[in-house]
Amino acid sequence: MINLTRQRYRVSNLVTGGTSLDVILSHSPNKFTFPPLLKSCAKLGDVVQGRILHAQVVKTGFFVDVFTATALVSMYMKVKQVTDALKVLDEMPERGIASVNAAVSGLLENGFCRDAFRMFGDARVSGSGMNSVTVASVLGGCGDIEGGMQLHCLAMKSGFEMEVYVGTSLVSMYSRCGEWVLAARMFEKVPHKSVVTYNAFISGLMENGVMNLVPSVFNLMRKFSSEEPNDVTFVNAITACASLLNLQYGRQLHGLVMKKEFQFETMVGTALIDMYSKCRCWKSAYIVFTELKDTRNLISWNSVISGMMINGQHETAVELFEKLDSEGLKPDSATWNSLISGFSQLGKVIEAFKFFERMLSVVMVPSLKCLTSLLSACSDIWTLKNGKEIHGHVIKAAAERDIFVLTSLIDMYMKCGLSSWARRIFDRFEPKPKDPVFWNVMISGYGKHGECESAIEIFELLREEKVEPSLATFTAVLSACSHCGNVEKGSQIFRLMQEEYGYKPSTEHIGCMIDLLGRSGRLREAKEVIDQMSEPSSSVYSSLLGSCRQHLDPVLGEEAAMKLAELEPENPAPFVILSSIYAALERWEDVESIRQVIDQKQLVKLPGLSLSG
């Protein structure tokens, strides 16, 4: 702040009215006079002073100086006066490579990517100059892989590929285009990697969800790089640990942070708070927060409040929230979201809505994330009133077209028992989204309410709309078929899942089919489904055994009980259930033999289970 004030004072004294102009002229301005002043204007975003300086450049005849004219182009680009910058470029008597670089970089920074690429192409054709900075600048604005590869070829032909600035830009470009493997190959090729190169590669890995490689790259840097990791490196590495829930490596990084004296850097400290919170070490997160002291900002406060909430320390979170004002800070949308979402996830609906009302009282507009969290908290008839209130806020916020909010609304009404309301919302939304989650909440909701035909209807509509069903979709519709005993439809969907969509049934799907076939008395078919599994779990045998008890099938019951006993040798339930089958069939000798087996194995009978059925 002090530096900026000095710059403003300097520029103001030199370029505003009367004496200032005399000062410039009396000191015989030269080609080194104007560029630093123009740079100061750019940093301050001071368009007015920049224009005054522009006039002085022209008046004193220094517009012909490439260095000064380039500084004008750069200044206008920095203060977002693109038209003025391009006009200066056009009027320049002679363009240099630096002028083209300033214009290309400025166009990219201001979002004029096509114009930047066009200017880059024109510069190549006209031969007005191109260097590694030009190529790196254009790579920085490239967002498609085809164009990026063409630029890569150009860099190779021009001999720029191995320059660290260009190599780093290529790593970033490939990462940005989702080609992290190509980014890794380019990273390996860069001969003299800078800390910026390592940071670009680590950031790219994180953007592409390959967090598991970040610790290895960080270790490579420490082992082979002549440069030390900086705050950006530490933030990225710590953030990766948070995503991986790698507490051990996170603690090692914390130790290194302290050794390098980065622990009081706001970004690094905030990343540590987030890492410890996600790794369920809330006490460590709190200690890091307290050690930040004067360097912590609202983001740090939001991180620790969120961390306390996700670790169930809601009282501490509220205490921290109440201290914000004493630190001269005001809660923002993220602060409120942390508390409201946290209380919602903890099932504390009253507290969640209490903070929601407080948020509204300070005229804070609820975010879509906040509304979604509150809707998820409304899960029964007792919270229906609250759910309807949030529906009103959804309408007020014109958020009825947001797929996540809409899905949460449907789910809320289904959970609260108003399937007809959920259906009205579903039917009104056109065109229907391709996200299967939107359809799944309808199918599972109908299934749980016993409206199985409606669940199947939605599934068929999903197929008509060419939506790709997920594994969860099949779980929901098979469960619905099981509840209504529709064996034919369930079997058809089970085959469809494998033959048409290529899914391998999970334990949940197998369980649904066993339950469906078992309820209908088709126990042999249920057993055949289990036999198709490579490693049947205890849950599928438990489901089959339950069906055997319902239909009094001692043969399959014995087989299921023995398999279940092998998988869970300490569990007495299979013997107790088998005993109840024998008792129902009045096979008392078998009941007694089961009792002896339980005694011999010293199994503790679970409460609620009877040996006599």
Curated annotation (Swiss-Prot):
Renumbered ranges of PPR repeats: 30-64, 65-99, 101-126, 128-162, 163-193, 194-228, 230-264, 265-295, 297-331, 332-366, 367-401, 402-432, 435-469, 470-500, 506-539
The keyword Repeat belongs to this UniProt entry's keyword annotation: yes
Pfam families on file: E_motif, PPR, PPR_2, PPR_3
Keyword Zinc assigned: no
GO MF term set: RNA binding
Family annotation (PROSITE patterns): PPR
Residue segments, region Type E motif: 540-613
Cystine crosslinks: none
InterPro entries the UniProt entry points to: E_motif (IPR046848), Pentatricopeptide_rpt (IPR002885), PPR_At4g14850-like_plant (IPR046960), TPR-like_helical_dom_sf (IPR011990)
Signal peptide (UniProt feature, chain positions): none
Gene Ontology biological process: RNA modification
Gene3D superfamilies: Tetratricopeptide repeat domain (1.25.40.10)
Record key words, sorted: Repeat
Family that this chain belongs to: Belongs to the PPR family. PCMP-E subfamily.
PANTHER family, sorted: PENTACOTRIPEPTIDE-REPEAT REGION OF PRORP DOMAIN-CONTAINING PROTEIN (PTHR47926:SF424), PENTATRICOPEPTIDE REPEAT-CONTAINING PROTEIN (PTHR47926)
NCBIfam families according to UniProt: PPR
Annotated protein name in UniProt: Pentatricopeptide repeat-containing protein At2g02750
Organism of this sequence: Arabidopsis thaliana
Lineage, uppermost ranks: Eukaryota, Viridiplantae, Streptophyta, Embryophyta, Tracheophyta
Gene giving rise to this polypeptide: PCMP-E22
